[in-house]
Amino acid sequence: MPSQDSDFPQKEHEKMTEFQEAVTFKDVAVVFTEEELGLLDSAQRKLYQDVMVENFRNLVSVGHVPFKADMVSQLETEEKLWTMERETQRNGHSSEIHSAVTSGSKIPNEMETLGKVMFKYLSCEELSCWQIWKHTTNDLTLQRKSSWFLHGDSLQVSEDENHIMNHKGDHFGCLENQEFLIPTAQASCGSRCLSESENPSRGKQMSVKNHLHVCEGFTKNSPLSDPGKTDAKQTPCKGERPHPCRVCGEGFSHGAVLPVHQVDPGEKCSHLQTHQRIHPGGTVNKCPKSGDGFHQNSFHPHHSNPTGEKSYRCDSCGKAFGSSTGLIIHYRTHTGEKPYRCEACGKCFSQSSNFQCHQRVHTEEKPYKCEECGKGFGWSVNLRVHQRVHRGEKPYKCEECGKGFTQAAHYHIHQRVHTGEKPYKCDVCGKGFSHNSPLICHRRVHTGEKPYRCEACGKGFTRNTDLHIHFRVHTGEKPYTCKECGKGFSQASNLQVHQNVHTGEKRFKCETCGKGFSQSSKLQTHQRVHTGEKPYRCDVCGKDFSYSSNLKLHQVIHTGEKPYTCEACGKGFSWRSNLHAHQRVHSGEKPYKCEACDKSFSQAIDFRVHQRVHTGEKPYKCGVCGKGFSQSSGLQSHQRVHTGEKPYKCDVCGKGFRYSSQFIYHQRGHTGEKPYKCEECGKGFGRSLNLRHHQRVHTGEKPHKCEECGKAFSLPSNLRVHLSVHTREKLFKCEDCGKGFSQSSRLQAHQRVHTGEKPYKCNICGKDFSHRSRLTYHQKVHTGKNL
């Protein structure tokens, strides 16, 4: 057969799943005699039972059934393996059933029919199993229910599935196509092994010479070692070694052996290693504690994996395993194979143990109970992790910040806080997350899904934790208490925010204006002042708002709802805050006090506006003339000067006003209302400002002084009139005649000359006058006072 060594490195991984070495039950079995079992206590018996059950399940999971169908259930009910062996020995099948236990073969009528056949052979050189397959059976496919036999130097496959024969000069016959390999007769020596991936197909022949694993103890007795039985084309002259190793220089008589020479010894065929244990006196394993040598089939409790050797290595990732079963299960991570499917939800698993644990999700079985709190768990590992909560154990420490964790998974997720890694991305908006569960919750923002419903009010939530927190609204539970003042909170985050009141800490700073905030959310909201962002829009009128709370307050305008009513006067309010502020009118409470002037205010907003009097702050600027104002309402009123807008109209005379305050004062002129009374003389006034000015007549106060001549005035308007004496400025011009006046009031009086208006009438004789001073002079005629 032509050599294909050149193809070997490139295609090494292409058929690894096909070349997986066969797993014998002997590789993983733990066998005790009846006397040895009698030395075990109950805990050791339970451990032995668990190990054997898992071994059987693992073999079943990869398609190997080297036992009766009910053996797993027998093991689970603590029936003993040695009992089954002893009963079989009485029936005359001692050697065969021992092989079934240790090697994984079977006996007719005792074991179920298996799927494939493997044999052990003898050869003079060693090759790993999958290399034999590579060199001999590239195009061969194993057919089920075929029989094999050794014929000379060739391995032939018979079509007769019941055919079993022994050849002259050979110590081996053939069995029905099986998955596990045993000799069919007791030979003195010369066992040859061929793994699962080496089986040729029906009707084909393959040369087995130089392609089989050899037991060094039997090489001399091999019929293949006779040069007369070898092919001249393949066998070099005696002593000749034409194939040297490039690394160490050692020569080999066959080129096919060279690649195996370069393979790590731990990767040699497992069947050869297993076979070597049957030689008398052979002690493959040695206990480092006691020094005892033992075969795997004479395992003692303290001899479990004594050397810690992991001879089964994955060619894909290099990971090593102590048994071939573990390697087979591991290899499914590369192939993606998941043979165990849940009938309830369709989820698939690569291991039977994980599948069995998953089924408890549907059955809600929780067999593992915590002795401390009684909490149940579906998996024992979850119970062990939970018990760390009671012990306060946190074995996983972060080297960056020293924070401890009870679970390794939580520790790994936490490390992403320091690394900034966010491997989980949202497909819709691209937002990243450090672990999977927040991504699942985030996706519900896009889908609108709210799977968690409150049974009390029907409100939906995207996260289960939000539902638990919300439910405290109904129960009134406040588990988080401030140690400083004893105030309770339903959420831990609210407690953390509250504690900033005591510490005064404001960790979150605005990079634009430097203002500090105790919460990051408040900083984010504040930044909209600088960006002008208004993400919340009213569906009714289209108005935008920077805050969701402002939108909710605004929407009450459209509904007209006033759910908050004052118990003292019955007045209704749309917002609770307005009700609280109104109630201070009745109580007289003014909790906001100015430290500069000791003035008090009932509302916080009035207090903040007042403070600008002392600071001189005028944050609201007119875009037309640049004039500044301390309040936004002042800016809005001022802008009407430029637009000429007068939205407030008098129903009596039709006069318009820019400001609501001016309109209110004007209406009192028609009604005669004068609510502000002087306590000294009883005179009434329509405006509080006029009362304050009048009181200066009694006090003699003249706060407005002329800087030119030092003359003082009680009113600022009088000072402005006086200043025109020094400047001789006449700003107010008559459009009819061009005459100038220093005061607007004098211009208005002058314009009556042109209009003929006489608004002042005598109540006694009905005579009209254009000026108030002239009416006053006329009234003295009727009173008889000296003119």
UniProtKB/Swiss-Prot annotation:
Subcellular location: Nucleus
BP GO annotations: regulation of transcription by RNA polymerase II
GO MF terms held by the record: DNA binding; zinc ion binding
Zn finger region (C2H2-type): 243-275, 312-334, 340-362, 368-390, 396-418, 424-446, 452-474, 480-502, 508-530, 536-558, 564-586, 592-614, 620-642, 648-670, 676-698, 704-726, 732-754, 760-782
Gene3D superfamilies: 6.10.140.140, Classic Zinc Finger (3.30.160.60)
KRAB domain sequence ranges: 23-94
GO cellular component, as recorded: nucleus
SMART domains, per the entry: KRAB, ZnF_C2H2
CDD domains xrefs: KRAB_A-box
One Pfam family linked to the record: zf-C2H2
Keywords carried by this UniProt record: DNA-binding, Metal-binding, Nucleus, Repeat, Transcription, Transcription regulation, Zinc, Zinc-finger
PANTHER family, alphabetized: GASTRULA ZINC FINGER PROTEIN XLCGF26.1-LIKE-RELATED, ZINC FINGER AND BTB DOMAIN-CONTAINING
Protein's job: May be involved in transcriptional regulation.
Family: Belongs to the krueppel C2H2-type zinc-finger protein family.
Protein name, as recorded: Zinc finger protein 227
Protein encoded by which gene: ZNF227
